[in-house]
């Protein structure tokens, strides 16, 4: 394990210029200024103001925040790394979000708003009754936040800074966490959403500049396929083919049996996982719940969906170019060569993006790209910090102290962020020892073992009136047992390195994690249905305004009092949103067909 430690990484000789330092300083100054400005605009002294931005956010910061929250530094490094390792197909994880984001705005948000909830476990408690499911989901969400989302983004961001600049790994981690937490604690959700909007702009501009320079290095887009096919390292392992780029690298749809990302799993399994992330996860849904009305929530989802089209060209293709330009480092397969290149024997695809930054970006622009990665890291972390504190405060603390006042709840919410920082920093050594070849695939594999049961409970709760608490609870437990079993087996039986036979159990070697997600969803759903049919039906109070079929028509999901909109204007913008949703799906289908 010591060989994989970050402390063993090669320290680059590149030093920051004065221009780079100025760019990074200006970035942080803008970030703090926007956070302070947005905090002054929103009321932070009420639970609704701190946790839901006073339910008065407009569509453009919501859309930008939805995008930025999902594009943390882990995704920047992970997507580029997976693109370098396997080609374009990983873009399906981004493009699939189009349909699920539309489902969020058109199906789930109306129900969440009409139920007058602040957190998603609160909705589950209203829909099913009882406290055990709500507590289960709150604790599970907090654990997932700490051990996957926060830790993964933190590790990837710190790895980027360490590789590019040679800064002390722990110092860069703690400083970034401290600044991130400062304006999250001070400003609540409004500060998070407005700083996300700023960081989205920085991320896109910086990534566009790097993409243009990367394509220029290989002679344009027309040369991408040929350049990638020739990205073979000079040192290989005899009698193996793992050093060769995939022959289907330019294909989105891959064979269900031999493909690394089979089209069946990317269509069905990924949709189940994406529904959990976009429609039932507190970090994401909280942004839509802050909308001033339903049209703004819909427009925010549409904007985020358009932005989710960009990573194919701005992250994944540059990752492929990085392997073409630096095959001995990014595409290494010999353990000793990988150890030299990035400090990890299992592979170095994760350094694809930072390698491009350090080799291609000139003085000044290098500082911009470092700011981009810091922006991605901080966008993701601020979102998770705020949403996790909301979960703990509203679902756990109020359960323990039902008489706690608003001042106490706000204080606890801020203290939870401090606690999350401590746990996350303590988890860094574990992540260092778990340094893997493809960070993004690891993240998705973990999600496939834990998310499908939650998706099943939410989907059945929304669309099936008969679903009750007993069925939902035992569906979650059955799914947790099966999913956790596979997860433990996966940690105990890692994939074999290049040139060694695969001796893992069949459930790991023969069943792709995306296919497993489908099976786990079906199992959990079957238990929910069986348990519900064998026990008494839910009470009417658990159905009214809480399912798609019983949503009251007179619930004020439209115009907000005092916003100056007439019913006619509201209906006009509703039609505009509907037209854009159809156009968006057409664009998405075109891209899928073009790269299929």
Swiss-Prot record:
<keyword id="KW-0762">Sugar transport</keyword>
<dbReference type="Pfam" id="PF00474">
    <property type="entry name" value="SSF"/>
</dbReference>
<dbReference type="GO" id="GO:0140929">
    <property type="term" value="F:mannose:sodium symporter activity"/>
</dbReference>
<feature type="topological domain" description="Cytoplasmic">
    <location>
        <begin position="37"/>
        <end position="72"/>
    </location>
</feature>
<feature type="transmembrane region" description="Helical">
    <location>
        <begin position="576"/>
        <end position="596"/>
    </location>
</feature>
<feature type="transmembrane region" description="Helical">
    <location>
        <begin position="150"/>
        <end position="170"/>
    </location>
</feature>
<feature type="transmembrane region" description="Helical">
    <location>
        <begin position="444"/>
        <end position="464"/>
    </location>
</feature>
<dbReference type="GO" id="GO:0015370">
    <property type="term" value="F:solute:sodium symporter activity"/>
</dbReference>
<dbReference type="GO" id="GO:0005886">
    <property type="term" value="C:plasma membrane"/>
</dbReference>
<feature type="topological domain" description="Extracellular">
    <location>
        <begin position="493"/>
        <end position="513"/>
    </location>
</feature>
<feature type="modified residue" description="Phosphoserine">
    <location>
        <position position="145"/>
    </location>
</feature>
<keyword id="KW-0597">Phosphoprotein</keyword>
<dbReference type="GO" id="GO:0008645">
    <property type="term" value="P:hexose transmembrane transport"/>
</dbReference>
<feature type="topological domain" description="Extracellular">
    <location>
        <begin position="1"/>
        <end position="15"/>
    </location>
</feature>
<protein>
    <recommendedName>
        <fullName>Sodium/mannose cotransporter SLC5A10</fullName>
    </recommendedName>
</protein>
<keyword id="KW-0915">Sodium</keyword>
<feature type="transmembrane region" description="Helical">
    <location>
        <begin position="16"/>
        <end position="36"/>
    </location>
</feature>
<feature type="topological domain" description="Cytoplasmic">
    <location>
        <begin position="195"/>
        <end position="200"/>
    </location>
</feature>
<feature type="transmembrane region" description="Helical">
    <location>
        <begin position="301"/>
        <end position="321"/>
    </location>
</feature>
<feature type="transmembrane region" description="Helical">
    <location>
        <begin position="472"/>
        <end position="492"/>
    </location>
</feature>
<keyword id="KW-0812">Transmembrane</keyword>
<keyword id="KW-1133">Transmembrane helix</keyword>
<feature type="topological domain" description="Cytoplasmic">
    <location>
        <begin position="465"/>
        <end position="471"/>
    </location>
</feature>
<dbReference type="InterPro" id="IPR038377">
    <property type="entry name" value="Na/Glc_symporter_sf"/>
</dbReference>
<feature type="topological domain" description="Cytoplasmic">
    <location>
        <begin position="286"/>
        <end position="300"/>
    </location>
</feature>
<keyword id="KW-0813">Transport</keyword>
<keyword id="KW-0472">Membrane</keyword>
<keyword id="KW-1003">Cell membrane</keyword>
<feature type="transmembrane region" description="Helical">
    <location>
        <begin position="356"/>
        <end position="376"/>
    </location>
</feature>
<feature type="modified residue" description="Phosphothreonine">
    <location>
        <position position="148"/>
    </location>
</feature>
<keyword id="KW-0325">Glycoprotein</keyword>
<feature type="transmembrane region" description="Helical">
    <location>
        <begin position="265"/>
        <end position="285"/>
    </location>
</feature>
<feature type="transmembrane region" description="Helical">
    <location>
        <begin position="201"/>
        <end position="221"/>
    </location>
</feature>
<feature type="modified residue" description="Phosphoserine">
    <location>
        <position position="141"/>
    </location>
</feature>
<dbReference type="GO" id="GO:0140930">
    <property type="term" value="F:fructose:sodium symporter activity"/>
</dbReference>
<dbReference type="InterPro" id="IPR018212">
    <property type="entry name" value="Na/solute_symporter_CS"/>
</dbReference>
<feature type="topological domain" description="Extracellular">
    <location>
        <begin position="322"/>
        <end position="355"/>
    </location>
</feature>
<dbReference type="GO" id="GO:0016324">
    <property type="term" value="C:apical plasma membrane"/>
</dbReference>
<dbReference type="GO" id="GO:0005412">
    <property type="term" value="F:D-glucose:sodium symporter activity"/>
</dbReference>
<comment type="similarity">
    <text>Belongs to the sodium:solute symporter (SSF) (TC 2.A.21) family.</text>
</comment>
<feature type="glycosylation site" description="N-linked (GlcNAc...) asparagine">
    <location>
        <position position="96"/>
    </location>
</feature>
<feature type="topological domain" description="Extracellular">
    <location>
        <begin position="171"/>
        <end position="173"/>
    </location>
</feature>
